[in-house]
Amino acid sequence: MKIACLHTAQSNVAIFDEAARALDLPQDALTHKVMPHLLEQAQAAGGVTPEIEKETIAALADLRTDADVVLLTCSTLGGAADFLAQDPGIMRVDRALAQATVTAGQPVVVLCAAPTTLHPTAALFRATLPQTTPLGVELIPDAWALFESGQHDAFHQRVAEAAQQAFARGAGCVALAQASMAGAERYFSHPKLLTCPRAALVQIAARIARERA
């Protein structure tokens, strides 16, 4: 199975490759396309504009022509994938993450780093989880500035600290809303700490297993 990933950060390439190796997916299963200007434009505009959405949809459709599955790995742009929702081969990784929280434990705390991710993430999780599930969607102060300045280790440490604090406050599970946050697992591990790359690739691995059965 060929899996094409559409990223807005180059650093996410290694994160997804690492997650694929951890799940024993074939070494050449993933291909990557990086379009950082999409997120840069969304941040400058204060959100996703129709033009950004249109370009994202076109990029997803183009990748789909040669891939069994296309993953949109940027949570800010996630809504663009919904325009192609009739195609089960196009996935937004944050939706896989939200689906994984349904049975992971309550209350659910979702941590975001980029301000532009906060609104689409909150909408997605509220739509996915049962109405009775306690849900908190939080922005980690100052984290995104670390990422944007290239201080990725400090960024992941800050995310890990926020996750640890959320569990200490009583979270049943903590979801890291952005793929770029997954590196926090190097600094803090917990069986109920969920990440986008793993959640999405677990779904795909399960699909592969069903097809082989």
Q: Which stretches of residues belong to each language-model region?
A:
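Non-catalytic structural scaffold of enzyme domains
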Residues: 1-213
